[in-house]
Amino acid sequence: EYGATAAMFFIDDNTLDYLRLTGREDTQVALVETYAKAAGLWADALASAEYVRTLHFDLSSVVRNMAGPSNPHRRVATADLAANGIAGPWAMPDAGTMPDGAVVIAAITSCTNTSNPRNVIAAGLLARNARRRGLTRKPWVKSSLAPGSKAVQLYLEESGLLPDLEQLGFGIVAFACTTCNGMSGALDPAIQQEIIDRDLYATAVLSGNRNFDGRIHPYAKQAFLASPPLVIAYAIAGTVRFDIEKDVLGIDHDGNAVTLKDLWPSDEEIDAVVKASVKPEQFRAVYGPMFKLHVDTGERVAPLYAWREMSTYIRRPPYWEGALAGARTLTGMRPLAVLGDNITTDHLSPSNAIMADSAAGEYLAKMGVPEEDFNSYATHRGDHLTAQRATFANPKLVNEMAIVDGTVRQGSLARIEPDGRVVRMWEAIETYMERRQPLIIVAGADYGQGSSRDWAAKGVRLAGVEAIVAEGFERIHRTNLIGMGVLPLEFQPGVTRLT
């Protein structure tokens, strides 16, 4: 998540305890210890290691944090939400309406966060405490729990915390990638319409890894990353304008005000439940069958895939045909987009829900796909005709060429040249494809950060982009561009798109 190829951590007794907890055999744990000590990876052996740079970090300074909006590295302590302009005074809405900053999606999700039993148990204990005090989530919050492992369900059942989570709306919906990859599913139509009618600042709070604009849901204007227990707290609060450390979450059965500190479990409580409820046999029951070999002697299949020409999920890609297989001219290129800093792969090829009025939605409708089966861009990436229409389809895109009435307009827009017309991005791409016009993209720093999404490179190549000039590229995306035959070029130091 921070751009490194690998991170090395020393091995100690805590590592071995985790291996035992997650069902590893004693012989394997002993082998890890023996190897680590022999290879110089054991904690004691690294005490005298010399490093190019040493950072000193005071663990006692760690407080509750969130990340957002818009970037995973935009950390903010929950105690500083008001100072950062996120939390603040907000008018109580009329009965039946949502407040400013409404949390419309609250999701405990992502294989990263749910692989830590302490995080999940902490969420369950907070849910239990909230339930006992008579608190529940706000009615406009779509909530879910999507663990990365089936072992999570087993230890939540063992601890008796699953019913408490379910009561607050955090029942298990899948063991899969869901909200964190833009696949939360549809909002309640009435809630979605209210967001549109009131131009409401609606948000998502999730325990995922990335929160780039437009990634989580088209109608969640921004998203915040939080720990699983904080996700539940925000589902109860119902808005990010809420000062989660100070404001009153609700009134209990006895008329007492309830704040976050009244619900937050202590480390001792969490450790006790983990010790009693998280067991090695749960992990063995889930993962053991994966390693039992089974030879399938059933029906033989052809060695080559039988392509279905009309499929909207997977069809034969054209990367080795026609213009895509020809030599690049690198001459006479017109700019498809001029972009700023921090363009993510979610800007380049979003993975979230396909809206009916999008280019991909209109294409799927023409192919006879009902709107309820549009699903997400991620599920249709095997069909290049759908995925092409996802290129730069993020509604939060800011193409500096898309100037309307003297100002740059946000959206999936481009300006066709030499016509000077500002149109939807796909219309511009389609026009340039018909003209066989080679294209170039100009951008700022950190181009291509975020998920290592190959379609972020495939899409621009299919659009006819031959080169991208930027102040800097994310390493994996740069490699993907080269693999697709798109030339990544960097400005000389001190030179930008604006100089």
Name each model feature, range by range.
Residues 13-14, 28-55, 63, 91-104:
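Core nucleic-acid recognition elements
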Residues 6, 14-19, 63-66, 111-117, ...:
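Flexible loop/turn segments at secondary-structure boundaries
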Residues 1-43, 121, 127-142, 171-290, ...:
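Mobile "lid/hinge" segments at catalytic clefts and subdomain interfaces of large enzymes
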Residues 140-185, 387, 457, 470-489, ...:
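Extended C-terminal subregions enriched in glycine
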Residues 164, 171, 187-197, 206-207, ...:
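Hydrophobic alpha-helical bundle architecture
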Residues 8-15, 25-32, 50, 78, ...:
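Generic structural signal for well-ordered, non-membrane alpha-helical segments
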Residues 54-160, 164, 296-467:
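Non-catalytic terminal/interface segments that mediate subunit docking, oligomerization
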Residues 51, 55-61, 204, 208-211:
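Self-splicing inteins and homing endonuclease
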